[in-house]
C-alpha cells in the first residue's frame, strides 16, 4: 500500500455536499482575519466545525437480507407502531416504526437500511419543528422513499428539523440500493424514520445510540449464522 493510500484511509473524507459551505466559511475566515485577527480564529473554528459536520466516514455494514440497519447516526427517539405518511402508499394500518434523531454533532449522511428497489420517492413541504417531536413525522418538511425487497415494503423518511432546511436525496425511482449504501443527506440536525412490514422485530430501544450503516435496528429472523460484512 502506498503512503498516499495509507493516509487516505486514516483521514475521514468530506462529503461533496459540504464543499460549498466549507469554502464559504473559509472565505469568511480570511475576511474576518483581515478585519480583526481574533475574529479570524472564530471563523477558523466555524470552518473546522463545518468540515466535521460534513464528514463521510466508511462503515462496516452487515450483509443480511433479514436485518434492518440504521439509516442515520444519532439517538433512537421512538420505537412503536405509527401510521406511515399517506403519500408513500404503504396502507391504512399502523406500521412498526423506528426513528433516529440526528443532532448537529452527528454525521448526516443517510444510508439505505435494507437492500431493495426504490419504487417511490415523494417530497412534501412542511414546517420546521423540532425533529425530535413525534408530530414532526407528519408536520415537518420531509422526503420519503419506498424500498421493496423479498421481505416486503419499507418506508424511509428524511425529516427536516429546526436547523435543517435542506433535504438532499441522491436516489431515484427505480434504483437498486444495497444495505448501507449512501442515498441522501440532511443539513444541520434532523431525523430519519424507518417503517417496516409485519414480521420485522425491533432490536433497539429509545435512547440507544445508532450508527448509520452499522447498527442493526431490527431483524426478521431470530436464529441464524453470523452475517458477512462490507466496508465502505
Curated annotation (Swiss-Prot):
Q: Name one GO cellular component term.
A: plasma membrane
| Gene Ontology terms, MF aspect | phosphatidylserine decarboxylase activity
Q: How is it modified after translation?
A: Is synthesized initially as an inactive proenzyme. Formation of the active enzyme involves a self-maturation process in which the active site pyruvoyl group is generated from an internal serine residue via an autocatalytic post-translational modification. Two non-identical subunits are generated from the proenzyme in this reaction, and the pyruvate is formed at the N-terminus of the alpha chain, which is derived from the carboxyl end of the proenzyme.
Q: Which cofactor does it need?
A: pyruvate
Question: What does the record give as EC number?
Answer: 4.1.1.65
The topology of this chain with respect to the membrane is:
Peripheral membrane protein
Keyword annotations from UniProtKB, A to Z:
Cell membrane, Decarboxylase, Lipid biosynthesis, Lipid metabolism, Lyase, Membrane, Phospholipid biosynthesis, Phospholipid metabolism, Pyruvate, Zymogen
Q: Give disulfide pairs as residue numbers.
A: none
Modified residues annotated as Pyruvic acid (Ser) in this record: 190
User: Its pathway?
Assistant: Phospholipid metabolism; phosphatidylethanolamine biosynthesis; phosphatidylethanolamine from CDP-diacylglycerol: step 2/2
> What InterPro entries has UniProt attached to this entry?
PS_Dcarbxylase, PSD-A
Self-association or partners: how does it assemble? Heterodimer of a large membrane-associated beta subunit and a small pyruvoyl-containing alpha subunit.
- The protein in question is named Phosphatidylserine decarboxylase proenzyme
